[in-house]
């Protein structure tokens, strides 16, 4: 990790301020180099490209000093940035061990440095797309399952690095509420069966836009989604900004969705968490 920090110039950035570094072990770095077919770290950097290599390394660093006791499960901003220069987030799950993006586990915690804390990792932690940031959060497993079962290969769509998205993501409880309100439906799979996979695709796309929409730029008004209105256009929802940010869908039978945690940044856009499933009918 020390060599990688020097190669990217991040060692200079870490010399001023307090930081938390999730550091893959030397064995992890060696396995990474070998798995990708390179001779050494220099060859890996050249093969990936300087910017991508730096982004991966910076994705292991948080600003501020955080011991393992300081963490709770949630999204954390890293020092990596995407093409829009927004700081990327990772998802940390705090259980018996700390897990980053459901893959990289902390195997030795709380190594105290002069200007922060180091936590040792058992694997490389890669930046995630807007889909990837939902995929790794167990509180959004219903949305993740719906994306996987819908027509149109939405997983690949929302992971596409050549595109930009904003995803308004309802949590599991929101899907549970929709299940309860849908006649003759008892669980998520029955809900999906009642909708059909084509309608499910449009339902998911009603929660996404094809542009970067950070909370600082949200205004009261209509927003075009990626959902098809059946006439060659796109369905819209309405944002109402007051004491809360509310999203009003096209159904009279559902409650407004309230915007919760916002500006969770992925490699290809942003995620905002909401508390209701939006219906575009």
Predicted ranges, named:
Residues 1-281:
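Mature, structured domains of secreted/extracytosolic soluble proteins
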């Amino acid at each position: 990790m020390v060599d990688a920090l020097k190669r990217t110039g991040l060692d200079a950035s870490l010399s001023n301020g307090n930081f938390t570094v999730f550091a893959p072990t030397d064995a992890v770095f060696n396995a990474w180099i070998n798995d990708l077919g390179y001779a050494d770290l220099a060859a890996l950097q050249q093969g990936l490209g300087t910017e991508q290599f730096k982004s991966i390394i910076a994705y292991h660093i948080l600003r501020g000093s955080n011991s393992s006791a300081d963490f709770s499960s949630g999204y954390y901003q890293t020092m990596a940035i995407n093409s829009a220069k927004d700081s990327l987030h990772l998802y940390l799950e705090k259980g018996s061990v700390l897990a980053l993006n459901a893959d990289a586990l902390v195997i030795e915690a709380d190594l105290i440095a002069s200007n922060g804390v180091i936590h040792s990792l058992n694997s490389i932690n890669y930046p995630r797309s807007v889909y990837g940031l939902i995929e790794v959060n167990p509180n959004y497993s219903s949305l993740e399952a719906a994306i996987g079962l819908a027509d149109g290969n939405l997983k690949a769509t929302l992971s596409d690095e050549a595109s930009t998205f904003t995803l308004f993501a309802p949590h599991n409880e929101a899907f549970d509420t929709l299940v309860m309100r849908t006649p003759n439906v008892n669980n998520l799979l029955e809900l999906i069966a009642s909708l059909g996979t084509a309608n499910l695709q449009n339902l998911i796309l009603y929660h996404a836009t094809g542009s970067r929409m950070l909370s600082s730029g949200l205004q009261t008004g209509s927003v075009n989604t990626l959902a098809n209105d059946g006439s060659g256009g796109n369905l819209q929802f309405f944002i109402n900004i007051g004491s809360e940010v509310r999203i009003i869908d096209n159904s009279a039978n559902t409650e407004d969705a309230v915007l919760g945690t916002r500006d969770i940044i992925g490699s290809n856009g942003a995620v905002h968490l909401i508390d209701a499933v939006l219906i575009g009918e």
